[in-house]
C-alpha cells in the first residue's frame, strides 16, 4: 500500500549508558519487503523490535511511522488461550474489526488453510504443537489487519518444510501491503527475506 513507511534515523540504544547494543542505524521500512533482523544473541534484535513497536524509546535518534495504524507482534513463545479453539483465536480479531460472525468464520478458515491449520480449526489451543501454535499466532497477527508485522524467531520450533511455508507466507503478507520485520537466527529465513539488517554492522 503506497504511503506506509517506518523511518529510522541514527537510532541507537543502550541500557547502561556506556555499552551500546547498536548505534547510527538508518533504515526506511516499506511494504512489499521482508526485513530480516540478524545478529548474535544479545545484539539487540528484540530491543529493536520493541522500538519499532513503539514500546521502547531509542536512547538516541528518531523513529517515524507514516500511515501505520495497527502493529502486531508475534512472539517467539506463542501465548494462546488453552481451551479456546484454533478458529476462535483467528475469528476474534476479525470480529473486533467489525465483521459479522459468518464473514469472520469464512476469513478465519481461509487464513488457517494458508497456514496449514485447516484441519486444526476445531482443536483447542492446548492441543497444538509448538510449530502449530507459532503458525496460529502468525495467522492471528494477519487477522488483526496490522500495517506493521513484527515477528520474533518465527521458525525456531519448526521443521524445515514448515519453516519454508512460514517464510513464504511472510513474503506473501508483505506483498499484500504489510511491512514485515523478522528477528531471526535462521539462515533460511534470512535468505528468504528481501532485505537484511545485520546489527553487527551498527556496533
Annotate the PLM regions.
Residues 102-120:
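Conserved ABC ATPase "signature" region
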Residues 84-95:
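Q-loop/switch helix immediately C-terminal to the Walker
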Residues 53:
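Helix-to-loop junction immediately C-terminal to a conserved catalytic motif
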Residues 149-152:
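Catalytic Walker B motif of ABC-type/P-loop ATPase nucleotide-binding domains
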Residues 141-142:
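ABC ATPase C-loop
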Residues 38-40:
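The feature captures the beta-strand-to-loop junction immediately N-terminal to the Walker
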Residues 160-162:
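Helix N-cap at the start of a conserved alpha-helix in ABC-type nucleotide-binding domains
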Amino acid at each position: 500500500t503506497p504511503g506506509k513507511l517506518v523511518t529510522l534515523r541514527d537510532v541507537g540504544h543502550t541500557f547502561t549508558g556506556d555499552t551500546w547494543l547498536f548505534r547510527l542505524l538508518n533504515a526506511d521500512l516499506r511494504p512489499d519487503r521482508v526485513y530480516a533482523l540478524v545478529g548474535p544473541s544479545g545484539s539487540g534484535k528484540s530491543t529493536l523490535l520493541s522500538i519499532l513497536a513503539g514500546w521502547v524509546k531509542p536512547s538516541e535518534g528518531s523513529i517515524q511511522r507514516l500511515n501505520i495504524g495497527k502493529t502486531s507482534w508475534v512472539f517467539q513463545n506463542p501465548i494462546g488461550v488453552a481451551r479456546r479453539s484454533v478458529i476462535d483465536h483467528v475469528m476474534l480479531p476479525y470480529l473486533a474489526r467489525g465483521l459479522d460472525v459468518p464473514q469472520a468464520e469464512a476469513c478465519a478458515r481461509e487464513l488457517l488453510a494458508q497456514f496449514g491449520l485447516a484441519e486444526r480449526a476445531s482443536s483447542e489451543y492446548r492441543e497444538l504443537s509448538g510449530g502449530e501454535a507459532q503458525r496460529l499466532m502468525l495467522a492471528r497477527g494477519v487477522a488483526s489487519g496490522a500495517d506493521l508485522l513484527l515477528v520474533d524467531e518465527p521458525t525456531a520450533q519448526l521443521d524445515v518444510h514448515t519453516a519454508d511455508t512460514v517464510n513464504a507466507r511472510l513474503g506473501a503478507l508483505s506483498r499484500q501491503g504489510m511491512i514485515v520485520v523478522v528477528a531471526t537466527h535462521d539462515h533460511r529465513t534470512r535468505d528468504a527475506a528481501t532485505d537484511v539488517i545485520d546489527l553487527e554492522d551498527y556496533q
